[in-house]
């Protein structure tokens, strides 16, 4: 209601943050958030299915949710959760997303913590390598969103140069202040 009459859109997340909901639940969530006013939908893939090689399931799910979005004029962003994936998984996901002509491919939720050999949890988020890979393999009409660990202006600029058309960031104020100090307008 506050944004009515502006060009600011609303994005809602489904299957968040683990992506483990069934396809039917994700489609129902998609339909509901669009009815509620979302113009973009961020959907977390079923990472377990991707890691297990259940590519037909992953493809069918992405298609079903993208179809629901497109039919209602919304844009789908498919979140890969790259911290859990190997390059071969990212390649396959880009192929699937290109096949279904999704609006965006996106690196992370921000919750993709993994346990390292020392028993500590770590998080990588968006990397220059993964952004370049996703840009190279995605349909030219598909945008790439870098999300996760974009906390500085320098990292933002690296992500943009690598091919990200959008960056999710929690340190926006700091980045804007740094940009202003550097003379960006």
Regions found by a protein language model. Give the residues of each.
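Alpha/beta enzyme core
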Residues: 1-144, 151-185
